[in-house]
């Protein structure tokens, strides 16, 4: 890759009086900041959200986990081989996260947008907490003299010294020459470090924990070794096409993201997609009265609203409180905005822009009203399609004077569009033939999704649409709680799905039921639309934990929150938090393929092979084939399996095609934090042993 001054990354000044104050002029790098944090305006909201997530949500204190029992077991239960491995692994893990802290610090010195620098600082702090956690484990379990020896192992153990150099050299080269090529290489190095280089050590700790040994050490590792948090198979996400199953998402799909600060919905392209195998605990929140439910992996965050204050926050699904003043939002307010970004441009300074589409509509047109009536009470005459006359004929019949008067009012409003019509009196009502010009841009159809574009409408348009809809194909019942509620019914699943999507964008809760007639081809879908409610109360909900084995899915968006639907139940939920550097790599490969030259792609594959071999040798060296439950063969196959998994997750072919199964499947379940219940008011983890904790 050509090295030019344009590709060099420059460190910012500590204080720059001539810098730009305006948020619109901020750049991730190569900007001109004063370097004074002025956060009254935020340009990169995704970074500020990430800062708050890492700084305040995903946090624990190592001292909260008592290590006394582990100290006793280290002295009396562990074999000499287990002690040696325990010490070597901790020494190595301390080094790895020490490198991470400095690597992020070097990045931060060149970042020129304050909110982005804060996010990097938060991640740097998390890595320092990891390093401190390893140190806390070490000094809690072994005596001070021995702990000092373990810190110094890298000077005495040549294998450990070489291990420390592997990733460190990539980071050092980036520091020496901070250009695009070295950025990609450092990114790959970071990805390998986080997703591969910890794992033989983690496998050793989990093997001990599986035998009931050093369980508090293992609990610390579980907090560090968190995985993606996802939705169960069958969950859908709201896109510009409507609700789409995660399995059917296209690369060009824009999804609805929710701003927790404003309650507004905008469209954006996901910057990460997750599809993976999962085996372990799932949680279901269910509202029996309305048949509303949602299912997600343990730890997946949902938006929770305090009904007294109106404030919203994120809580893991297993910790959502079920009481009268707690609610889960199920809809937002779409204002016509699209959040656009290019991840490489984020790094090079162009950032995220929020644009309002000029084509958005605030009011229904007469033609749109006519199409709503067509869906409810009309038919399209397929034989009189206007091939020779230029007019498609539509047929209507009404017996109620209310509908007759309203329909003729709409027809008169449609006259400027070239609509013509005739009416015929019948014994039981009035029939109409409407002549619909073929040259109108909107074609007559019985399906809403063929003429409504979700990105071209606003909340005002949606509410007017719903008002018009229930005039023709529904009614306004009297709710016992005196809430404003509409009722709509249809036999068309497409229309049911689309109305739910509209209501989710228009700030309205929906409840769906199905009534199947044995004599009818299709069931009748009944939708109750609560115009004044955009949430569902948790008071009468039921929370269930159950075992699940199968696929899970999710996406990641800049705002961190998405609109999902499961079994016709809509809600706002947090998206998954996935490996940052994996997302950077994947997005760069799509948006900036020129950076991934054949030479760079060859280097990535070869470096992955090298890293896998180094991790295998390290794991075998540490365990010496003397640890019950894990041996050299298992380590080799496990690390090769992870190597295949990690490299395919960034778009490359498996490097070990002969390895297709995870030989240590039990780790994926064992490492979940589902046997630790944390009381956040007391901030003290309480661990409850489960019967399956020692299963083999």
Curated annotation (Swiss-Prot):
Family matches, as InterPro entries: Ferritin-like_SF, Hint_dom_N, Hint_dom_sf, Intein_C, Intein_endonuc_central, Intein_N, RNR-like, RNR_small
Keyword vocabulary terms for this entry: Autocatalytic cleavage, Deoxyribonucleotide synthesis, Endonuclease, Hydrolase, Intron homing, Iron, Metal-binding, Nuclease, Oxidoreductase, Protein splicing
Domain DOD-type homing endonuclease intervals: 377-507
Xref: SMART domains: HintN
SUPFAM superfamilies listed in its UniProt record: Ferritin-like, Hedgehog/intein (Hint) domain
Record note on modification: This protein undergoes a protein self splicing that involves a post-translational excision of the intervening region (intein) followed by peptide ligation.
PROSITE patterns in alphabetical order: INTEIN_C_TER (PS50818), INTEIN_ENDONUCLEASE (PS50819), INTEIN_N_TER (PS50817), RIBORED_SMALL (PS00368)
UniProt signal peptide: none
Active site as annotated: 134
BP terms from Gene Ontology: deoxyribonucleotide biosynthetic process; intein-mediated protein splicing; intron homing
A GO term for molecular function: metal ion binding
Cofactor note: Binds 2 iron ions per subunit.
EC code(s) of this entry: 1.17.4.1
Cofactor field: Fe cation
Gene3D superfamilies attached to this UniProt entry: Ribonucleotide Reductase, subunit A
Binding of Fe cation 2, residues: 127, 194, 228, 577
Binding site for Fe cation 1: 97, 127, 130
Superkingdom of origin organism: Bacteria
Reactions it catalyzes: a 2'-deoxyribonucleoside 5'-diphosphate + [thioredoxin]-disulfide + H2O = a ribonucleoside 5'-diphosphate + [thioredoxin]-dithiol
Function: Provides the precursors necessary for DNA synthesis. Catalyzes the biosynthesis of deoxyribonucleotides from the corresponding ribonucleotides.
NCBIfam families reported for this sequence: intein_Cterm, intein_Nterm
Record family assignment: Belongs to the ribonucleoside diphosphate reductase small chain family.
Subunit and interaction comment: Tetramer of two alpha and two beta subunits.
Protein name as it appears in the record: Ribonucleoside-diphosphate reductase subunit beta
Organism this protein belongs to: Aquifex aeolicus (strain VF5)
């Amino acid at each position: 890759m050509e090295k030019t001054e344009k590709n060099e990354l420059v460190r910012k000044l500590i204080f720059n009086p001539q810098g730009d104050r305006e948020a619109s002029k901020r750049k991730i790098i190569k900007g001109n900041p004063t370097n004074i944090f002025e956060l009254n305006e935020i340009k990169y909201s995704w970074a500020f959200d990430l800062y708050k997530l890492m700084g305040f949500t995903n946090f624990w204190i190592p001292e909260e986990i008592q290590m006394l029992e582990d100290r006793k077991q280290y002295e009396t239960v562990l074999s000499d081989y287990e002690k040696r491995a325990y010490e070597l692994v901790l020494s190595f893990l301390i080094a790895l996260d020490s490198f991470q802290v400095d690597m992020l610090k070097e990045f931060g010195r060149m970042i020129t947008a304050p909110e982005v620098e804060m996010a990097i600082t938060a991640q740097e702090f998390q890595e320092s907490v990891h390093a401190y956690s390893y140190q806390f484990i070490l000094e809690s379990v072994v005596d001070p003299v021995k702990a000092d020896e373990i810190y110094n192992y890298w000077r005495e153990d040549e294998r450990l010294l070489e291990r420390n150099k592997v990733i460190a050299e990539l980071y050092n080269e980036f520091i020496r020459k901070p250009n695009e090529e070295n950025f990609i290489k450092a990114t790959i190095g970071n990805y390998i470090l986080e997703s591969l280089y910890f794992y033989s050590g983690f496998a050793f700790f989990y093997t001990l924990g599986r035998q009931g040994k050093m369980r508090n050490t293992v609990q610390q590792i579980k907090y560090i070794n968190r995985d993606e948090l996802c939705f169960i198979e069958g969950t859908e996400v709201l896109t510009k096409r409507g609700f789409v199953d995660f399995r059917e998402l296209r690369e060009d799909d824009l999804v609805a993201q929710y701003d927790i600060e404003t309650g507004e919905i905008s469209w954006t392209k996901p910057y990460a997609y997750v599809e993976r195998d999962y085996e372990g605990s799932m949680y279901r929140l269910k509202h029996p009265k309305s048949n509303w439910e949602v299912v997600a992996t343990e730890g997946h965050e949902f938006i929770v609203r305090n009904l007294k204050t109106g404030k919203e926050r994120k809580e893991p699904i297993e910790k959502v409180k079920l009481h009268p003043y707690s609610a889960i939002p199920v809809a937002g307010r779409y204002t016509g905005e699209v959040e656009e970004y290019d991840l490489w441009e984020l790094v090079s300074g162009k950032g995220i822009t929020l644009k309002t589409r000029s084509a958005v509509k605030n009011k229904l047109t007469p033609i749109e009203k006519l199409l709503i009536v067509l869906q409810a009470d009309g038919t399209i005459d397929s034989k009189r399609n206007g091939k020779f006359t230029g007019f498609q004929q539509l047929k209507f019949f009404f017996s109620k004077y209310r509908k007759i008067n309203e329909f003729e009012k709409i027809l008169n409003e449609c006259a400027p569009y070239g609509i013509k019509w005739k009416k015929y009196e019948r014994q039981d009502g009035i029939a109409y033939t409407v002549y619909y010009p073929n040259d109108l841009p909107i074609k007559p159809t019985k399906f809403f999704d063929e003429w409504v574009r979700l990105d071209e409408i606003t909340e005002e348009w949606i509410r007017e649409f719903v008002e018009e809809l229930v005039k023709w194909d529904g009614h306004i019942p009297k709710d016992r709680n005196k809430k404003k509620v509409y009722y709509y019914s249809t036999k068309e699943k497409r229309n049911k799905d689309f109305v739910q999507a509209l209501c989710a964008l228009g700030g309205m809760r929906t409840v769906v039921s199905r009534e199947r007639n044995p004599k009818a081809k299709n069931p009748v879908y009944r939708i109750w639309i609560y115009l004044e409610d955009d949430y569902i109360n948790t008071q009468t909900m039921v929370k269930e934990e159950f075992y699940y084995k199968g696929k899970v899915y999710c996406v990641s968006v800049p705002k961190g929150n998405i609109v999902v639907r499961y079994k016709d139940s809509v809600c706002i939920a947090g998206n998954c938090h996935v490996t940052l550097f994996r997302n950077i790599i994947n997005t760069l490969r799509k948006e900036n393929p020129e950076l991934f030259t054949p030479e760079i792609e060859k280097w990535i594959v070869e470096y992955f092979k090298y890293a896998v071999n180094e991790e295998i040798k390290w794991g075998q060296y540490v365990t010496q084939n003397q640890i019950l439950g894990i041996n050299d063969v298992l380590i080799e196959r496990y690390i090769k399996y992870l190597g295949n998994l990690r490299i395919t997750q960034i778009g490359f072919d498996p490097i070990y095609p002969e390895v297709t199964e995870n030989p240590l499947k039990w780790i994926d379940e064992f490492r979940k934090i589902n046997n630790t219940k944390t009381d956040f008011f007391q901030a003290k983890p309480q661990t409850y042993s489960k019967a399956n904790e020692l299963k083999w």
